[in-house]
Amino acid sequence: MKYNQWISISDMMAGIMMIFLLITVSFMLITQKAQEDLRVQNQKLLEINEAMSSIAKDYSDLRQELYEALLKEFGKDLKVWDASIDEDNTIRFNEPEVLFDIGAKQVKKRFKDILDDFFPRYVKILALEKFQNSIEEIRIEGHTSQVWFAANTLEERYLGNAELSQARALEVLKYCFNLKSINSYKEWLVKVFRANGLSFAKPLEDDDKSRRVEFRVITKANKDLLKILDISKDFELK
């Protein structure tokens, strides 16, 4: 009887030890898998970070190179045109009296003369292979002051100026696009040339200077970054 009891206890202890052994082995396997999963995720995140850093550097280099090219081409003309080039390569025409009559969308003669000189040279630079492949949009933006005659509400002022700024931007686009000197670029321009009216959404410190036209280059960097961010969602840590 005692012998049978001892055998039963021995079997039970052996069973318990086997259970602990299985638990230990399972835990080790789970830990190893978790470590491997973590290693893979960290590697993917590192690759994503390197890709984003590369895009940011390429964008910064491209922006600087384009800025230097624009400044070299138009540096002597900016004062004559009362224009400026911002660090983001926005070219701003600042003199409202030269651009349009108050409340009118028609491009004035003096501004047409400026565009005749400016736009073909501008497009020629942007169409260079080192810039063209990175350009998402060439955008003409119309901006206004916060004034709208006979307006009694913010809504009336904003919507009136939105309509006017859009009409002005479109008139500038139409004039530029109809220049015969850019005929060889038109197929490309159809894909990237845009006109936007922003009303007084982006005012300058001087309300009169807020009445302006800007030429902006939008690169593909943002789209590339968004693609990478979408991919990164698959590797978020749980």
Tell where the protein language model's regions lie, with residue ranges.
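Periplasmic OmpA-like peptidoglycan-binding domain that tethers envelope proteins to the cell wall
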Residues: 105-109, 114, 143-222, 226-229
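Acidic/histidine-rich, surface-exposed loop or edge segments in extracytoplasmic proteins
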Residues: 91-104, 153-156
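Short terminal targeting/anchoring segments
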Residues: 1-64
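Short edge beta-strands and adjacent turn/loop segments
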Residues: 77-93, 136-138, 144-146
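Surface-exposed acidic, glycine-flexible loop patches that form ligand/cofactor-binding
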Residues: 82, 127-132, 185-186, 205-206
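Periplasmic peptidoglycan-binding/anchoring modules of Gram-negative envelope and division proteins
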Residues: 71, 104-139, 173-178, 223, ...
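Functionally critical alpha/beta secondary-structure elements and their flanking flexible loops
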Residues: 66-78
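Short helix-terminating capping/connector loops at secondary-structure junctions
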Residues: 77, 130-135, 184-192
